[in-house]
Amino acid sequence: MAKEKPHINIVFIGHVDHGKSTTIGRLLFDTANIPENIIKKFEEMGEKGKSFKFAWVMDRLKEERERGITIDVAHTKFETPHRYITIIDAPGHRDFVKNMITGASQADAAVLVVAVTDGVMPQTKEHAFLARTLGINNILVAVNKMDMVNYDEKKFKAVAEQVKKLLMMLGYKNFPIIPISAWEGDNVVKKSDKMPWYNGPTLIEALDQMPEPPKPTDKPLRIPIQDVYSIKGVGTVPVGRVETGVLRVGDVVIFEPASTIFHKPIQGEVKSIEMHHEPMQEALPGDNIGFNVRGVGKNDIKRGDVAGHTNNPPTVVRPKDTFKAQIIVLNHPTAITVGYTPVLHAHTLQVAVRFEQLLAKLDPRTGNIVEENPQFIKTGDSAIVVLRPTKPMVIEPVKEIPQMGRFAIRDMGQTVAAGMVISIQKAE
């Protein structure tokens, strides 16, 4: 069987109104991922329908966004010669950060859209910094609205230089910077004849050359549980996405924090594994699976539990333990002080955590300490903090298992901060 094309999850980031949605719309439109019947309608209108058609697509996308849902996920897959690409979310959506951290869709790469008319804006910086914090290692830049400056090379170069500085400071290397006009369709899918001075790839060509994300098969097995079903004739079937490691039929797995909470090992042998209703012998990172474990009942485990091998079980942080984390405060109405107890979201879990200590405030750009033991931290600050969970939960240091070490902090219906676990302090 021929090797299937790799799947890549892309997230679009950038300042509000710089053209993220238009760029997505143009990609889908020019790769013919807009429903056939709609295209037909406009073709019947002849010339008049042409410019109209793209505007209509954009309106549809906008309408869906205003109803509080991002672009209908069914339409956000498209294919390039060497990749299947899924657009997993477009920011501006209030749960964007939470979705990126807890979603089954960790982004492999980001497209940073910057309008040539504005250059780097506050949100451009914030999104780029966030992409770094969330572990997105590949980024490409689309300098949009080139039609508004008559496709001027000088203006492009000036903005490209700003973006380059920002991204290099954050530790990004080797990122293409592409001049585009999403509205006119220049250099998104079709090569532009209006910028003869540019000889690099179009946006879709650059996406097609994205490095394939490595599968972390060498890391310990971790499967955060999304749901637990009881299936007649089979038994209890936990469902989740393999984040790291490999699960094989016959393996013995243990569930945490269930085992810690019940004071007995909730574990058993894996009798069967299924993906998309097909039985399989082994599951790899990225696979969304259901699996049946001998001797584990429906009431033993729930969403937020994590399965791992018994010889390398998931790490549990209990209320008597703490963990040290680096966070970036995205949105807090006043200030965060010791004692603040919001809800932490990571993989499939949600647990209230208490801020025990504010160790240091960092310069978000360099990571250097600017203040030790600050009294408070506020929106825009990056900090090292000590957190204590109010009940047992599974989380791992980002250096050991990055896929299990990132989290969002939420309160009052919004994402207050994003962060990553530096180390875990167990109380003996």
UniProtKB/Swiss-Prot annotation:
The keyword GTP-binding applies. Residues 89-92 are annotated as: G3. One of its GO terms (cellular component) is cytoplasm. GTP binds at residues 14-21, 89-93, 144-147. Residues 5-215 form the tr-type G domain. GTP hydrolase that promotes the GTP-dependent binding of aminoacyl-tRNA to the A-site of ribosomes during protein biosynthesis. This is Elongation factor 1-alpha. It comes from Thermococcus celer.
